Amino acid sequence: MAHSVKIYDTCIGCTQCVRACPTDVLEMVPWNGCRAKQIASAPRTEDCVGCKRCESACPTDYLSVRVYLRQETTRSMGLAY
């Protein structure tokens, strides 16, 4: 089941979320916006099972990676109107 995965620019490039993902949804890509020169990316969201282990592994206070489960996304879209 595909879920929406959003990586925010508060990512520090630590790779914790990538290592925590049991289905290999995340990978690191080059980015000059942080000291590590890399940021998490979610190229395979169709494999996301919604376990949110990536969120739990994120050491930033900003929760740089967020998984929006299908029902959460639908609910959020309804509030936008």
Curated annotation (Swiss-Prot):
Cofactor(s) annotated in UniProt: [4Fe-4S] cluster
Residue stretches in coiled coil: none
One Pfam family cited in the UniProt record for this chain: Fer4_7
Signal sequence range: none
Subcellular location: Plastid, Chloroplast thylakoid membrane
GO molecular function, one term: 4 iron, 4 sulfur cluster binding
Gene3D superfamilies, alphabetized: 3.30.70.20
Top-tier EC class: oxidoreductase
Any Gene Ontology CC annotation: chloroplast thylakoid membrane
Topology in membrane: Peripheral membrane protein
Residues engaged in binding [4Fe-4S] cluster 1: 11, 14, 17, 58
Catalytic activity: reduced [plastocyanin] + hnu + oxidized [2Fe-2S]-[ferredoxin] = oxidized [plastocyanin] + reduced [2Fe-2S]-[ferredoxin]
Single GO BP term: photosynthetic electron transport in photosystem I
Keywords, comma-separated and alphabetical: 4Fe-4S, Chloroplast, Electron transport, Iron, Iron-sulfur, Membrane, Metal-binding, Oxidoreductase, Photosynthesis, Photosystem I, Plastid, Repeat, Thylakoid, Transport
The enzyme's E.C. designation: 1.97.1.12
Primary localization: plastid
Ligand binding ([4Fe-4S] cluster 2): 21, 48, 51, 54
Cofactor note: Binds 2 [4Fe-4S] clusters. Cluster 2 is most probably the spectroscopically characterized electron acceptor FA and cluster 1 is most probably FB.
Domain 4Fe-4S ferredoxin-type stretches: 1-31, 39-68
NCBIfam families: PS_I_psaC
Function recorded in the entry: Apoprotein for the two 4Fe-4S centers FA and FB of photosystem I (PSI); essential for photochemical activity. FB is the terminal electron acceptor of PSI, donating electrons to ferredoxin. The C-terminus interacts with PsaA/B/D and helps assemble the protein into the PSI complex. Required for binding of PsaD and PsaE to PSI. PSI is a plastocyanin-ferredoxin oxidoreductase, converting photonic excitation into a charge separation, which transfers an electron from the donor P700 chlorophyll pair to the spectroscopically characterized acceptors A0, A1, FX, FA and FB in turn.
Quaternary structure (record): The eukaryotic PSI reaction center is composed of at least 11 subunits.
Protein's UniProt name: Photosystem I iron-sulfur center
Source organism per UniProt: Welwitschia mirabilis (Tree tumbo)
Gene: psaC
